[in-house]
Amino acid sequence: MGKKAHGGKMKPEIDENGTLLVPPPRTIANQDHFHRLNYLYQISAYQTRARQKARTDAHTPLARNYIKSMDLISKKTKTSLLPTIKRTICKKCHRLLWTPKKLEITSDGALSVMCGCGTVKRFNIGADPNYRTYSEREGNLLNS
């Protein structure tokens, strides 16, 4: 990592911007929780797609239950979900917002997505076109 100083301790490496360079972790903590959350999201997405193809609501309660379980497990294990996943889930009824009931762009530059339960989720899309969330930015440990 760095060179040893006079006291025998490692001197930290700092780049030209003043950022402390830290090696990425060798393992991911709570990897089994992430696998479980990923599986629940994928199976819910599969059930939602199966419902759309069959044009029936037979799979809807099961898909919503998977999303609700994913939310409860992430809270219980204190594991944060990525913002891209949070944007696709209705907080009230735990549905995936892939086929919204109503979709509109408001006059203030926000995208309004209405779920089947009537909940409206707003995304500010006109404020800053160059805005990226932390997980979408270049140079963080998630992209390494």
Swiss-Prot record:
Residues holding Zn(2+): C90, C93, C115, C117
Annotated stretches, region: Disordered: 1-22
EC top class named in words: hydrolase
tRNA processing as UniProt keyword: yes
Catalysis: reaction(s): Endonucleolytic cleavage of RNA, removing 5'-extranucleotides from tRNA precursor
EC number: 3.1.26.5
Primary location recorded for the protein, binned into one broad class: nucleus
GO molecular function: metal ion binding; ribonuclease P activity
Cofactor: binding details: Binds 1 zinc ion per subunit.
Protein name as annotated: Ribonuclease P protein subunit RPR2
Species: Saccharomyces cerevisiae (strain ATCC 204508 / S288c)
Gene that encodes it: RPR2
